[in-house]
């Protein structure tokens, strides 16, 4: 993996150095593996405690999906910063920058998978998506957590939103406790908004496509139980 080895460098200019992104990546991967272990243990405990059949089936499905994605989420984590060497620039005001490293890294994923003879199917697309989107929750958490920004994130990440959030939470390796606490709190707010949006979307799907007034007009009915039956 020369793309990963290329991260093992620290460059200094005008007394300002960037972090070693190779060791950062290993730390993020370690954080993610610990988080996965905790999540899986939590799901298994919930399954053991569940008494409702529907809840059990849902938990079994959650565990099955989690197990299926576990390895590929680790690949996404391992490759999340591989675009940094190609995107590294020096700015006299900001110091070292890595703008668009997520986009550049995502473009590198297919070649890496092909060379390593890894699957070139949806697993590769999944890893590519994680690499591409991994800066989005961080950008949201670093600013005001708005509904519109979270909505765009949910639409783009789709069913992989929880995996993406796990990667981003693992990506917080700052030794500044105040900064780390702020990011984690904002990520908690992002997760809350995601849960609300998903719940609202689900409830909206359950709503009938037409209302009572439209039914009365369509069938020439007056307000009655029959209207309610048709609406149901």
Predicted regions, residues:
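Short, surface-exposed acidic
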Residues: 1, 118-127, 222-229
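Charged substrate- and nucleic-acid-binding regions of tRNA-handling and nucleotidyl-transfer enzymes
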Residues: 109-115, 174-232
């Amino acid at each position: 993996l020369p793309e990963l080895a290329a991260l093992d460098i620290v460059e200094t200019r005008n007394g300002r150095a960037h972090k070693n992104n190779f060791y950062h990546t290993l730390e993020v991967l370690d954080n993610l593996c610990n988080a996965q272990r905790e999540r899986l243990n939590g799901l298994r405990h919930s399954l053991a405690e569940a008494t409702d059949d529907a809840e059990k089936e849902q938990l079994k499905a959650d565990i099955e999906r989690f197990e299926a994605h576990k390895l590929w989420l680790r690949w996404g984590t391992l490759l999340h910063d591989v675009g940094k060497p190609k995107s590294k620039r020096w700015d006299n005001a900001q110091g070292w920058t890595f703008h668009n490293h997520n986009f550049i890294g995502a473009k590198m994923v297919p070649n890496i998978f092909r060379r390593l003879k890894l699957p070139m199917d949806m697993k590769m697309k999944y890893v590519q998506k994680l690499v591409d989107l991994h800066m989005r929750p961080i950008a949201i958490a670093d600013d005001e957590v708005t509904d519109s920004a979270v909505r765009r994130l949910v639409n783009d990440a789709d069913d992989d939103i929880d995996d993406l959030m796990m990667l981003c939470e693992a990506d917080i390796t700052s030794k500044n406790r105040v900064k780390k606490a702020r990011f984690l709190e904002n990520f908690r707010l992002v997760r809350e908004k995601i849960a609300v949006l998903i719940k609202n979307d689900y409830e909206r799907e359950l709503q009938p496509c037409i209302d009572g007034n439209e039914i009365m007009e369509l069938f020439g009915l007056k307000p009655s139980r029959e209207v309610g039956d048709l609406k149901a």
